[in-house]
């Protein structure tokens, strides 16, 4: 007997003649719907509470469905191919960093290239991948300010603006420099007064 006839079919015996009745795909025997990792399926209910030969897939929280969400039992097979539930990774938060693909969430196996803004250097991997557990691998890198060698002893002028990474730090440096000048001036005045007193006391 052919493999497709080795199933139990509904039949009708009429006047001594056996008739095989047409059966729906579900009765003819689709196996259980495919199991999807990190997801689940529900069977569609039709009119009068009858179960239809269709199932709908949904993913667990933190996962997104890739593929068709609805499968039908046709010719004893589920069609189309079962979907996948892939993990979602949050957007990497990298101060002074830029991402090759800028979006709120990333799908499992998606790669992102990290670049740092002007004056900042990358500490860590340049390429990171969204993994199946919803985390990034390797570890998310950092962007740190690169301190030029010729900036070590800079205290004032145009060079100061070139060496400091942003306007806020330039303002702070200038305020500190101004304070240091005022302190030196005060020290000179005190020293001058001391010398004057010493001169008159002789």
Swiss-Prot record:
Keyword Magnesium belongs to the record: no
Highest taxon of the lineage: Eukaryota
N-terminal signal peptide: 1-28
Pfam family, one: C4bp_oligo
Occurrences of domain Sushi (ranges): 29-87, 88-145
Gene3D superfamilies attached to this UniProt entry: 1.20.5.3730, Complement Module, domain 1
Tissue: Plasma. Found on very low-density lipoprotein (VLDL), on chylomicrons, and in the D > 1.21 g/ml fraction of pig plasma. Found in liver, spleen, lung, bone marrow and lymph node.
Keywords for this protein: Disulfide bond, Lipid transport, Repeat, Secreted, Signal, Sushi, Transport
KW Hydrolase (keyword) present: no
SMART domains in the cross-refs: CCP
Primary location class: secreted
One cellular-component annotation, GO: extracellular region
GO biological processes: lipid transport
Annotated S-S bridges: 30-73, 59-85, 89-130, 116-143
Subcellular location: Secreted
InterPro entries named among the record's database cross-references: C4bp_oligo, SEZ6_CSMD_C4BPB_Regulators, Sushi/SCR/CCP_sf, Sushi_SCR_CCP_dom
Function (record text): May be a lipoprotein-borne regulator of either the coagulation or the complement cascades.
Complex formation: Forms high molecular weight disulfide-linked complexes.
Name recorded for this polypeptide: Apolipoprotein R
Annotated organism of origin: Sus scrofa
Gene that encodes the chain: APOR
């Amino acid at each position: 007997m052919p493999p497709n006839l080795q199933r139990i079919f509904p039949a009708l015996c009429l006047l001594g003649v056996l008739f095989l009745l047409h059966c729906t795909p579900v009765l003819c025997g689709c196996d259980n719907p495919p199991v999807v990792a990190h997801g689940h399926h529900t069977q569609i209910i039709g009119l009068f509470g009858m179960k239809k030969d269709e199932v709908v897939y949904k993913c667990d929280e933190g996962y997104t469905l890739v593929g068709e969400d609805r499968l039908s039992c046709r010719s004893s097979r589920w069609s189309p191919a079962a979907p996948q539930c892939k993990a979602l990774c949050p957007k990497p938060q990298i101060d002074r960093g830029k991402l090759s693909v800028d979006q709120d969430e990333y799908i499992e196996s998606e790669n992102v290239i990290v670049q740092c803004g002007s004056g900042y250097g990358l500490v860590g991997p340049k390429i990171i991948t969204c993994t199946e557990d919803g985390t990034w691998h390797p570890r998310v890198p950092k962007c740190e300010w690169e301190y030029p060698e010729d900036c070590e002893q800079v205290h004032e002028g145009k060079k100061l603006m070139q060496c400091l990474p942003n306007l806020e730090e330039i303002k702070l440096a200038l305020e500190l420099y101004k304070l240091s000048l005022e302190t030196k001036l005060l020290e000179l005045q005190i020293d001058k007064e001391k010398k004057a007193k010493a001169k008159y006391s002789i």
